[in-house]
Amino acid sequence: MDARVYWIWLQNAFGAGSAKPVQLVRRAGSAEALFRGGIGLWSSFTFVSDRELAAMSAYGVREAEAALDYCLRLGQQVYTPDTPGYPDLLREIYNPPAVLYVRGTLPDASGDIAIGVVGTRKAGKAGLRAAREISYELAQEGAAVISGGALGIDSEAHRGAIDGRGRTVAVLPCGLDYPYLMDNANLRREILDSGGALVTEYPMQTPVQRGAFQTRNRLISGMAHGVLVAEAPKKSGALITARYAAEQNREVFVFIGEDTAAFAGCIGLAADGAARIRTAEDILRAFSAQRKSARTALLRQAAENVARPARRVRVVPLSDSAAEAAEAEKTPAAPQPEAGLSADAQRVLASLGGEPKHAAVLEAETGLSAGSVLAALTELELLGKIRSYPGQRFTKSD
């Protein structure tokens, strides 16, 4: 049986965004060995919750095999951490996707510089122009542009790269065949026609769910060597991508077109150490060694990133993601308690104390999925209930 089937089984059991599938495979030796070990082996791992054990038992490989066959019949690529073609940069992050579904052609991280370009959906003229022009210049210099395929800054970044005859990748928060944001259906076709790719960790026919945008954002930064925030107000979801970039030891860049509320998030990032830029050359200068000898330099940077401490970036709550979710198919929200917190947020908050605790620990302690934990943390950040630290660690606020 194709080894990817066992990874799909794991992805089905744990959902998108969890670090546990890769951790389990490392301990078991292979995804197949993990599957064949059965409940006796799985229950020996103390960080796997009872609910996750039940999911591992409930999902079978026949369903996973059918899913793989379906994707391959449609001409899509399915990558797992142990297959050629899986992005090397994603192997570096804490929670790499167990399965990556791809339509089109991914850039070669060992030879191409990749820059994530993100920002608000409701951008003004200055931010939109900067996103398009800088992405155009990046493409002209051979860099790949990674973004989220949404309206606003994302769309301009993709179109700039296409106009520059470069390659661009849209990382989606749903299955590749789900009718997400049909206003951009033509853009997605243009991305493929220009030699780029559509990427997701969600199985086919998966709609946009609560927390999917935040979970997806770690892949935009994870697939890139650096991330540019082209325009972001104080409560933009793009700032979560910047936080991921810092935690993943990626370079963080900001464009500040005006000293106004529209760029308040970018101004805050600059105050916290992000590099302020005006042109693509400002970004590429940070990767000058790679441009001279791409393969050698990029591999050296990957090795250095493992040891380099994460850059501290201030965490701010989301508003753009909430607006995006309103466009998508919604999952009914749980009834809100009197305290004003969702049930998931209550559980996460109850697990936190004065000592920083990693998001993966919160998953294990609460029994929630990675996406649910991330959504709960975002809610708690919005209300000022928690503080965040580099490396996806959190405490209760003072």
Named regions from a protein language model:
Residues M1-P84, K385, S397:
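Short, small/acidic-rich helices and loops at N termini and domain boundaries
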Residues M1-A3, T80-D398:
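Glycine-biased, small-residue-rich flexible motifs in mid-sequence functional cores and linkers
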